[in-house]
């Protein structure tokens, strides 16, 4: 699954795969040695000295984590081109219903399989590389008083997830602080004036965030469409939403990849409860 996504990303990028300097692979679907990063390097025929980073068991916030790491690598290694791949196969979480763990049914109802890939770099080559979004600022934080809100354990039975019912409340309670930290330096306080890419942990989370911030329903349109079409694909979701947004923006003749707007936010929520924040700037279409 990850290979298919990577092949598509490299083709659209338009550069030879020999130009890839770093690989970040993220999955919550299993643990192997050598890891999925090694397997993908072999499957794609990448150079053996590509610098690899393997992220296991991070959960749903990791779509933001991989972007943050890729940004740091690209900015601190001149000429770096980072292949980012998130691949999730949620069959490892599937099991029969249990009276003692009804919360795991919520996850099984929401989860889906998916893989997404992109290339991250700085100083794009004119006429060859066509950026889609620019990452301006990133942050990671642990929400206060949230320990145990989302957790997972890899055991003989597979991957078990446990979700507290107040997860949507914890996310909505902490999102305002994250937004102020991200957008105050840009003098942005109207969150309807930016585009939104939020990890769709479930409809209840999106509903509470909309209500808390007074967001217009169309702000979460791309997010809800991905959740409806594919389910919660853990780390891959926010990358699917990025793709959905830039394609719809082009189809509708809007002026930027971010629904015609300049600034936007990408949020990842997951075990901890951990929140990843990425401030994005769109690119003219």
Curated annotation (Swiss-Prot):
Q: Which residues form the active site?
A: 60
Describe which pathway this protein belongs to, using the record's wording: Secondary metabolite biosynthesis; flavonoid biosynthesis
The protein's superkingdom reads Eukaryota
| A Pfam family matched in the record | Chal_sti_synt_C
Keyword annotations for this protein? Answer: Acyltransferase, Flavonoid biosynthesis, Transferase
Instruction: Kindly report, in one word, the top-level EC class recorded for this enzyme.
Output: transferase
Q: Sorted alphabetically, which InterPro entries does this protein's record hold?
A: Chalcone/stilbene_synt_C, Chalcone/stilbene_synt_N, Chalcone/stilbene_synthase_AS, Polyketide_synthase_type-III, Thiolase-like
Report if keyword Transferase is assigned.
yes
- The reply to whether Acyltransferase figures as a keyword in the UniProt entry is yes
The enzyme's E.C. designation: 2.3.1.74
Recorded GO terms, molecular function?
naringenin-chalcone synthase activity
- Biological process GO terms, please? flavonoid biosynthetic process; polyketide biosynthetic process
Q: Which reaction does it catalyse?
A: (E)-4-coumaroyl-CoA + 3 malonyl-CoA + 3 H(+) = 2',4,4',6'-tetrahydroxychalcone + 3 CO2 + 4 CoA
Family to which this protein belongs: Belongs to the thiolase-like superfamily. Chalcone/stilbene synthases family.
Q: What does this protein do?
A: The primary product of this enzyme is 4,2',4',6'-tetrahydroxychalcone (also termed naringenin-chalcone or chalcone) which can under specific conditions spontaneously isomerize into naringenin.
Against PANTHER family, the record matches this protein to:
CHALCONE SYNTHASE 7, HYDROXYMETHYLGLUTARYL-COA SYNTHASE
- Name this polypeptide is given: Chalcone synthase 6-4
Can you name the source organism?
Medicago sativa (Alfalfa)
């Amino acid at each position: 699954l990850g290979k298919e996504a990577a092949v598509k990303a490299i083709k659209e990028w338009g550069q030879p795969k020999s130009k890839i300097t770093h690989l970040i692979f993220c999955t919550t679907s299993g643990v192997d040695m050598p890891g999925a990063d090694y397997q993908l390097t072999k499957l794609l025929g990448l150079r053996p000295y590509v610098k690899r980073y393997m992220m296991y068991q991070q959960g749903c916030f990791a779509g933001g984590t991989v972007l943050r790491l890729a940004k740091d690598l690209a900015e601190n290694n001149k000429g770096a081109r980072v292949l980012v791949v998130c691949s999730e196969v949620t069959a490892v979480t599937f099991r029969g219903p249990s009276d003692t763990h009804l919360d795991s049914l919520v996850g099984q109802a929401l989860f889906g399989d998916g893989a997404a890939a992109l290339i991250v770099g700085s100083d794009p080559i004119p006429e060859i590389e066509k950026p889609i979004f620019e990452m301006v600022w990133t942050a990671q934080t642990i929400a206060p008083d949230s320990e145990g809100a989302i957790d997972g354990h890899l055991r003989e039975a597979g991957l078990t997830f446990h979700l507290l019912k107040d997860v949507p409340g914890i996310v909505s309670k902490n999102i305002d602080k994250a937004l102020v930290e991200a957008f105050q330096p840009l003098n942005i306080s109207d969150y309807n004036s930016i585009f939104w890419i939020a990890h769709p942990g479930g409809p209840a989370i999106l509903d509470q965030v909309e209500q808390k911030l007074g967001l217009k329903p169309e702000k979460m349109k791309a997010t809800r469409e991905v959740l409806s079409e594919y389910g919660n694909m853990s780390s891959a979701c926010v990358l699917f939403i990025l793709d959905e947004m830039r394609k719809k923006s082009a189809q509708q003749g809007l002026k930027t990849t971010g629904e015609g707007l300049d600034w936007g936010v990408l949020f990842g929520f997951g075990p901890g409860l951990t929140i990843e924040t990425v401030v994005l700037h769109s690119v003219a279409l």
